[in-house]
C-alpha cells in the first residue's frame, strides 16, 4: 500500500492558488487571505480579476474584490440562466426582456466606468455573459468557446478609450490656458502692483465775466486734463457747485 501523501495549501504554486481563489465566494476569499502573508499576496494579485466567476451581477455593487494599480485588463464573466434573453436581437425582445437586459447593461456600465475612473492603468475593460452550465459548476467561457452563444459585447471595450479621450481633451484645454496666460513677474521697486489708484475727479470750472460792452454770461472754460482714452471715454459733465471744489 502506497503511503498517504499530504500537501499543505501554501506549497501550491501561484497559478494553482489563483485558480482556487477564483472559485471562492467573497467571504471565503477574505478569510483565507487573513491566514498567512502568502495567501494575502494572492488575494491582492491583479491577475485574480481575470479568473473571477460571478454568480450574479449584484456582486459588482459590493466591495468584494481588491483592485490593484497594476491591473491593465478587466474581463468580467458571469453565468446566467437568462443568457438566451440577453443575446438575442433587441428588436426581437419583449418589453419584459428589454427591462431585464437594461438593468444588466446599466449595472455593468456604471461599474466599469467607476473602475476606469479609479484605475488609470486599465486599457481594455470587457464583460461577458455565459450560459449557466448544467452541472452547476462554474466554467470560464471565452469569446471563441463553442458554448458561447452571444456576442462578445465589444462595445464595452470603448469605455476606457472614451474616458481617456475626455481626460486628454481636458489636459489640452488646461495647457492652452496656461500657455496664453502671461507670466507674472514681481513689480520693480517703487512701482505699485495692480491697476493704478483712481485719481481726483475732473472738475470743469465755470465763471461769469463782465465784458466791456456790458454783456454778461460769457463763460470761459478751463481746459480739462486729458482723460487717457479720448476716443472711448467721456469726461464727467459740469455740475452746479463745482467752484466749491479746491483747485
From Swiss-Prot:
Gene Ontology terms: biological process: proteasome-mediated ubiquitin-dependent protein catabolic process; protein ubiquitination
Cytoplasm is among the record's keywords: yes
Spans annotated as Disordered: 124-154, 173-247
InterPro entries: F-box-like_dom_sf, F-box_dom
Residue ranges with Pro residues bias: 184-200
One of the record's GO cellular component terms: nucleolus
Pathway: Protein modification; protein ubiquitination
SUPFAM superfamilies registered for this protein in UniProt: F-box domain
Entry comment describing in which tissues the protein is expressed: Enriched in cardiac muscle.
GO-annotated molecular function: ubiquitin protein ligase activity
Compartments in which it is found: Cytoplasm, Myofibril, Sarcomere, Z line
Record Pfam families: F-box-like
Protein keywords: Cytoplasm, Ubl conjugation pathway
Oxidoreductase in keyword set: no
Record's signal peptide: none
CDD domains (UniProt xref): F-box_FBXL22 (cd22129)
Residue ranges occupied by any F-box domain in the UniProt entry: 6-52
Function: Substrate-recognition component of the SCF (SKP1-CUL1-F-box protein)-type E3 ubiquitin ligase complex. Promotes ubiquitination of sarcomeric proteins alpha-actinin-2 (ACTN2) and filamin-C (FLNC).
Subunit structure: Directly interacts with SKP1 and CUL1.
Official protein name in the record: F-box and leucine-rich protein 22
Protein species of origin: Homo sapiens
Amino acid at each position: 500500500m502506497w503511503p498517504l501523501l499530504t500537501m499543505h495549501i501554501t506549497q501550491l504554486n501561484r497559478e494553482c492558488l489563483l485558480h482556487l481563489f477564483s472559485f471562492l465566494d467573497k467571504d471565503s476569499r477574505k478569510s483565507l487571505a487573513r491566514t498567512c502573508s502568502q495567501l494575502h499576496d494572492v488575494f491582492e494579485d491583479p491577475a485574480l480579476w481575470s479568473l473571477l466567476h460571478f454568480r450574479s451581477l449584484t456582486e459588482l455593487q459590493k466591495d468584494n474584490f481588491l483592485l490593484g494599480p497594476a491591473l491593465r485588463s478587466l474581463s468580467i464573466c458571469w453565468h446566467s440562466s437568462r443568457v438566451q434573453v440577453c443575446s438575442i436581437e433587441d428588436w426581437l425582445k419583449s418589453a419584459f426582456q428589454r427591462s431585464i437586459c437594461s438593468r444588466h447593461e446599466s449595472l455593468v456600465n456604471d461599474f466599469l466606468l467607476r473602475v476606469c475612473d479609479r484605475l488609470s492603468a486599465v486599457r481594455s475593460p470587457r464583460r461577458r455573459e455565459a450560459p449557466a452550465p448544467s452541472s452547476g459548476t462554474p466554467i470560464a467561457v471565452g469569446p471563441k468557446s463553442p458554448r458561447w452563444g452571444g456576442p462578445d459585447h465589444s462595445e464595452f471595450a470603448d469605455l476606457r478609450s472614451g474616458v481617456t479621450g475626455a481626460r486628454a481633451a481636458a489636459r489640452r484645454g488646461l495647457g492652452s490656458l496656461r500657455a496664453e496666460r502671461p507670466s507674472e513677474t514681481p513689480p520693480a521697486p517703487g512701482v505699485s502692483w495692480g491697476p493704478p489708484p483712481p485719481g481726483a475727479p475732473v472738475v470743469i470750472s465755470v465763471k461769469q465775466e463782465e465784458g466791456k460792452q456790458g454783456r454778461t454770461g460769457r463763460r470761459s472754460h478751463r481746459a480739462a486734463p486729458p482723460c487717457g482714452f479720448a476716443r472711448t471715454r467721456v469726461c464727467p459733465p459740469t455740475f452746479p457747485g463745482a467752484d466749491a471744489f479746491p483747485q
